[in-house]
Amino acid sequence: MQLTKHIPITGLFCALLLTGCVTPQLPKVLQPDDAPVSGQEQPPVSPVPQAELDRATELALTGDYIAAAALYQSLATRMPSPYRQDLQLQAVASFLLAQDTESASWLLGQTDVTGLPAVFDLRKRMHASELAIRNSKLKEAFSLLEALPAEDVSIDLQQRYHRQRAQILRLEGNLLESARELGLLDLLISDPVARLHNQQAILQTLTILTDGVLKILQPDPPGIQGGWMELARIIKGYEGDPASTQLLLTQWRERFPEHPARPALLEGYYQRLQTQYRQVRDLAVLLPRSGALADAATALLNGFMAAYYQVPAAKRPQLRFYDSSNAADTWPLYRQAVDAGADMVIGPLNKDAVLQLARAGELQIPVLALNQIPPQMGQPENLFQFGLSPEDEARQAAERAWQDGLSQALAIVPEGAWGERILSSFRDRWESLGGTLLEYQTYDAKAQDFSRPVLTLLDIDESEQRRREMQRVLIQNVKYEPRRRQDVDFVFFAAKPQIARQIRPLLQFHHAANLPIYATSHVYAGSPNPKQDRDLEGLKFPDIPWLLAGEKGSRLSQDALAALFPNAKRIYQRLYAMGIDSFNLIPHLERLKMSPWETLDGQSGNLYLDEINQVHRRLMWAQIRKGIPDVLGYAPRVESGLTTPGSDLPPLIFPTVVPNTPVPLAPSPVPAVPTPGADKQI
């Protein structure tokens, strides 16, 4: 599966190119973009047969793109320049809509726009950029659009140019620059509804970023980009107090009096925040007090209660606790909580208990379960699932390696169901991005020596076998230096700290010291240990911000909770962060459900919901340097089947063909757009 599966704007973009590239040419009637400068000669009438042109357009609009492309090509062979090139570009758009990238690429290569008006070069580059996107070559796609449109290019085409650049930047994970590009697009839109949609896309893009990132990178007032960033922070920080939020919005407008944000946008967000913020007054907590999950439940509850007591007493919900040690009691406990007047349930923790609720049909009150299960048929809409999923980490490792420009992977995971889950998640995500998993090996976590799977993974054992075979044939000693396979870009592995500290040195010893290593958070014990972790030198891994970059001095920091719970087991410390987030998620679940692009900055990651109401965590990345994690920050969130904000904007009309005439054309009026640097670039 290729990256194009995740680019919903593609079809829309091609359709826009197709439906308007050649507007019907009426004899001796000028089209808007062809209006000549006053007093100059009229351009010639189009020689393109109107009936055939209408037929090609009709075929395209009814979805018969191949037939449309064939007719456009046929027309092109009979037309002089520049009508020939215009029709060729229309055919390219048709092939793209038909998913025939091979034909589109070939025909684009045959389309010579040398010497033609700048609009032709721009259209060709935009098509080439689209092909690069479909081939997962995002850097190439963006480089094709680095040159700004010429001044005489129509507003409509300039709009599409900025929208496509914003799309590429978003796919690369560069959300800040994607939002900036949408901001430039915004200044070109005159239709109030279309502009409102675009401004919503700007805020949807920026609210994915953490509050910390927005705060650090926000320029000073009164720049446009800084205004969007501050507005995104206000939206992200909403805590259920309409009066305070209204005051913040009023103060924002005073700080950014000339900002283009429409009043309808601010009012709409204000109303939406009020309706989507869940006020819970009676909260039921279902956690086991005994059994295998009791210690984990205690850690979760400690974090939960620490967050609970940060809320002013008047705003805290009433808590009701239920012992869910026996998973079979889950449904009766849920009914008991409902009958007692609970507004919402937190828990259960056991997967079988979560499964009971998933198969219950409808749930009268919402549930935030503290574990995740595979999707179920007829799963209740108000069942939310939150857990420290290792599958999330494996997928993010794949995304990080892909963003780092790598494509050929090896993997090593433990034997058993846990390792299989991690491997499957890594492989599926890696291959969906366009990467190749060359080989994987498993290891016995109870073993003392992990040399065999490492040797096999690197093909060192095959190299040794060839040496023995040569020595047998030659009947003499053969000078030999083992050589690992050379077709690999990096290694992914999952292991607990003690095992990771053995596997990493083995990879280095067997000639893989220069290979990047990506791992899950399980390689890190949770606190700096330079003496032991020096064996992990160079390894990259994702982990929760609470451990890697927790706010010092906070009442919810790692140190603060360690002081509160001195007897807590270190292996459960990530569950403390999850407990904090489980409480803080409650009022935001409806907002996150309504918009999968929006996030909550949590202690266990940057949190967002998928289409089945499972909470996912975007984690912080670190690299071991001198035995200590060096924080790299959050990796960009890679698209995964979501509709890109702004991709549903109203369609625009593509500019007409520019006749091949020496008469200069009047440039389209363009609103003043800030040049790079005018708005304090970041």
Predicted regions and their residues:
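Bacterial signal peptide processing site
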Residues: V22-Q25
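Solenoid-like repeat scaffolds
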Residues: V37-S46, Q73-Y83, G109-F120, E146-I155, ...
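Beta-alpha junction/loop-to-helix N-cap segments that form part of ligand/metal-binding clefts
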Residues: V119, D295-L300, Q310, A314-P375
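Extended repeat-based interaction scaffolds and adjacent low-complexity, acidic/S/T/P-biased segments
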Residues: S154, R160, L176-Q274, Q279, ...
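Extracytoplasmic ligand/sensor domains, especially the bilobed periplasmic-binding protein
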Residues: M344-G347, K351-Q441
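Extracellular/periplasmic periplasmic-binding protein-like sensory domains
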Residues: I460-R467, Q486-V488, R504-I580
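Solvent-exposed, acidic/polar segments of extracytosolic/periplasmic ligand-binding ectodomains
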Residues: P530-K531, Q603-I682
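Segments of small-molecule ligand-sensing domains
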Residues: A560-V631
